[in-house]
A protein has these predicted regions:
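Non-heme di-metal
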Residues: 2-392
Length: 392
């Protein structure tokens, strides 16, 4: 992004998602990729605040749990706090400078903001469960099992940031060479170096998108399974389950967004060069998913090292991780080496929490979480109105 506001007229319907013209007017009347506008509207309709959920009863129930079950809950909370600390700033910081599609730009900003709500949720939970929440937060950076997962995510974001700076420097060198009299050879060399830097950045961005996709698709779900299990099979911690249900609902949107971007790049919608990059990076992208698979299985073992939860075990979680990995890799166009023994969902009841439409509750009994706000369809034309007039 060479400027925060491009004053040159641009056909937004012809702009690629990345590496196009600078962004100008923020407009939402037309979109090349309607998916991003739909995701933004859906995310805005989901707006929620963690303080809406009362956790007083959860705190009392948590204090009655045996120590190993308290540790399972706390460690998952720490892990999710770390993941959303990254996601609450990284998508906008790393991707926004490269975006040239207005609807994608708005979606990335909306997505990143929603992640900050998730981070605030963990603070809300900790304040209600622990007498000293600051101590729990301070322990996160000291936990090796958590931090090695952060390193594998942050590395790819940082690589995009570094390669973006290198590319921008090369662009500046090209402009400098143009101003140098009788320096055709220098200009030619600068243009060549800029092209090399741009392609390296494109590869870095493509792999980073897979890292983000794997994070949204797999990394949260061991924690989700444990949190929802407290409510489903132990009939406690309903407030926390509600908050995690809100978070899981948001993550489904974020996952859909990254999957869509990847498939568009892989199919050449934004140019043949992306198809070549997708082919070159296929093995590394698949390896990223398999590494996430391995790390999450390690995390399950770490969580259950001192004891388990009724209804869950390391074996069940491992099958759940494999089930997710196969499905998610297929959805983002990658080959998967895992062969499932069964195609049945290892934790079928979790769908109740991941799909809000499956839950029916009496409003007077529980706080409803399955409602939307500001969901009005404004695309009403004369044909629709004519259909209504027959009832007048």
């Amino acid at each position: 992004m060479s400027t925060v506001f491009n004053t040159t007229p641009v056909d937004v319907l012809a702009e690629p998602m990345f590496f196009g013209s600078g962004l100008g007017i923020a407009r939402y009347d037309i979109q090349r990729h309607k998916v991003f506008e739909e995701l933004t509207e859906k995310q805005l309709s989901f707006f929620w605040r963690p303080e809406e959920v009362n956790l007083m009863m959860d705190g009392a129930q948590f204090n009655k749990l045996p120590e190993h079950q308290q540790n399972i809950f706390t460690n998952n909370l720490k892990y999710q706090s770390l993941l959303d600390s990254i996601q609450g700033r990284a998508p906008a910081a790393a991707l926004a400078a490269l975006v040239s599609d207005p609807s994608l730009d708005t979606w990335i900003q909306t997505w990143t903001f929603s992640e900050t709500i998730h981070s605030r949720s963990y603070t809300h939970i900790m304040r209600n469960l622990y007498t000293d929440p600051a101590k729990v937060f301070d322990e996160i950076l000291l936990d090796d099992a958590i931090m090695k997962r952060a390193e594998s995510i942050g590395h790819y974001y940082d690589d995009v940031l570094n390669k973006t700076r290198q590319w921008q420097n090369q662009i500046a060198f090209v402009e400098l060479a143009k101003e140098t009299p009788e320096a055709d050879e220098r200009l030619e060399r600068a243009i060549k170096q800029e092209a090399i830097a741009k392609r390296a950045l494109m590869k870095s961005l493509y792999l980073c998108l897979h890292v983000i996709n794997a994070l949204e698709a797999i990394r949260f779900y061991v924690s989700f399974a444990c949190t929802f299990n407290f409510h489903k099979n132990m009939e406690i911690m309903e407030g926390n389950a509600k908050i995690m249900k809100f978070i899981a609902r948001d993550e489904q949107l974020h996952l859909k967004g990254t999957q869509y971007i990847l498939r568009q790049l892989q199919t050449g919608v934004d140019g043949d060069e992306w198809v070549k990059i997708a082919h070159e990076c296929e093995a590394e992208a698949a390896a990223i998913f398999m590494e996430v698979n391995r790390q999450e299985k390690e995390w399950a073992v770490h969580l259950f090292k001192d004891g388990g939860l009724p209804g869950l075990s390391v074996e069940i979680l491992n099958r759940f991780i494999d089930y997710l990995t196969v499905s998610r890799m297929k959805q983002c166009g990658l080959p998967c080496e895992i062969v499932l023994e069964s195609t049945k969902h290892p934790i079928p009841w979790i769908r109740e929490y991941l799909n809000s439409d499956n839950v029916q509750s009496a409003p007077q009994e529980v706080e409803l979480s399955a409602y939307l706000v500001a969901q009005i369809d404004n695309d009403v034309d004369e044909n629709v109105l004519a259909g209504f007039r027959k009832y007048l």
